[in-house]
Regions:
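Beta/alpha (TIM)-barrel catalytic core signal, keyed to glycine-rich beta->alpha loops juxtaposed to Asp/Glu
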Residues: 51, 62, 66, 74-213
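Active-site beta->alpha loop and helix N-cap motifs at the rims of alpha/beta catalytic domains
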Residues: 1-81
Length: 213
């Protein structure tokens, strides 16, 4: 979360009030609006943040959500603002209300890990670009290497092919040798590409968890 395009589309289709009503949690429009209104009146950042999370989770009602990820557009924006407390609020809320683990997607893994560690968020799930040539790895390749070796967290590697800049065999062989990586996320244009990538992962990472494509 969040899926930003749905908010823009809802505003176009239903107007501002209609969009708000569609995305408020099921405890009731008035209760949720009052909670949000009181939060704004009191400048209660925690109340506002939890309301936004609950609104986003409404579409998943009745489904198991073992991990709830905060998208990098939000994570990196909060990092840039220095609003680190938002990560603690998010983590505590998804654990307490949804019995889920918080996940964080970022383009600056080293900086995020330092912040999460300072907040006391232990062994976090972090999805980030991790590849052999440092493609879109903000903070620098060496900082990522140190973090993977020294930090206690569960890494999900994405952009492992660096948008096609690294041959598949070379990319998978390298990422499978890195410490602390628990999963690999990749995109594929067809079944054959998925199968060949899966075979490479099985070859270089025989004890790997399930592959996500």
């Amino acid at each position: 979360m969040p899926y930003a395009h749905k908010y823009a589309n809802a505003m176009t289709d239903y107007g501002m009030l209609g969009a708000i009503k569609r995305f408020l949690p099921d405890e009731g429009f008035l209760d949720a609006a009052m909670r949000g209104g009181m939060s704004l009146a009191k400048k209660d950042i925690e109340g506002i943040t939890t309301l936004l999370v609950d609104a986003e989770m409404k579409m998943f009602q009745g489904l198991k959500t073992p991990v709830i990820f905060l998208q990098n557009v939000v994570v990196d924006f909060l990092l840039g603002l220095g609003f680190n407390e938002a990560f603690r609020i998010f983590a505590n809320h998804v654990k307490a209300r949804y019995n889920a683990e918080p996940g964080f997607i970022t383009m600056n893994m080293p900086r995020l890990l330092d912040v999460l560690e300072a907040l006391g968020i232990e062994n976090p799930i972090v999805c980030a670009n991790i590849n052999k040539i440092g493609f879109r790895m903000c903070g620098g390749f060496e900082a990522y290497e140190r973090a993977l070796k020294e930090k206690k967290f569960r890494a999900i590697a994405m952009s492992v092919f660096a948008s096609g800049a690294i041959p598949p065999k070379e990319a998978i062989e390298w990422v499978c040798r890195q410490p602390n990586i628990e999963s690999i996320v990749f995109g594929a244009s067809g079944r054959g590409n998925i199968r060949s990538t899966r075979e490479l992962v099985d070859r270089y990472w025989p004890t790997a968890p399930p592959v996500a494509a």
